[in-house]
Amino acid sequence: DMEDPYITYTSKYMETVWWLIKQIYNKDLMYKGYTIQPYSPKAGTAISSHELNQPGTYQDVTDTSVTAQFKIINENLPDFLDNKEDIYLLAWTTTPWTLPSNTALTVGSKIEYVLIKTYNQYTYKPIEVILATDLIQKLFSGNYFEVSHESELLEFESKSNKIPFYISNKFIGKDLLGLKYEQLLKYALPAENPENAFRIIHGDFVTTSEGTGIVHTAPTFGADDALVAKQAKPQIPPMLVKDKNGDLVPLV
């Protein structure tokens, strides 16, 4: 209606929006939550989808990815993981600056995973890790080679050019759900319900096309992360901490 358009900066429009919000509030349909929104540090405001679709906004860039080790808490483990050795989950991320805000690890319930026994390529100490079966060749290539028997691992010497690895067990992501792990960077805890953090959850977005099949999850920063955290039962809390005014703010 070009003769009578609505214009967002007019008093009539703004008063109408506030009236609608009041009706929603009076019907007890409004609640306080936390969502992930594009934000402009320069403008100090959220950014609309229209602004994000302006020419030149999106660019193809090369990301640096990180594979981090998360240590499983050795309590009430399923039989296929119940041993006396430390086990680490290999989680992949292209946003390593969000690792201090990690509160969950996400797997695919139907994806097949493996427990691998090998040696740390930096310390040459024995280590056991979990990752997706389909990504073994991507992560364990170059300096690594597979052996058929666990006993062959004992033949490894730190001066060797090649590091052996042995597939100890196979299972699906569903078997890992609910397992707890140690917080990676212990700077702070979520201000609310920290006891529900640092556990393995399911996410439909997890694939085996790249990474490890285990996704570092920081609900404070990622839209997908925030969604799966809210869908988890109980919900995964975001890494929000209280500032000097007692307000919950992201840990950056």
Task: Locate each region found by the language model.
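Conserved alpha/beta enzyme-core scaffolds, especially Rossmann-like or related mixed alpha/beta domains
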Residues: D1-A46, D60-I72, T93, I200-G211, ...
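Non-cofactor substrate-recognition interfaces
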Residues: D1-T8, D79-L89, P96-V252
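Polar, glycine-rich mid-to-C-terminal structural blocks
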Residues: L29-M30, Q59, V66, F70, ...
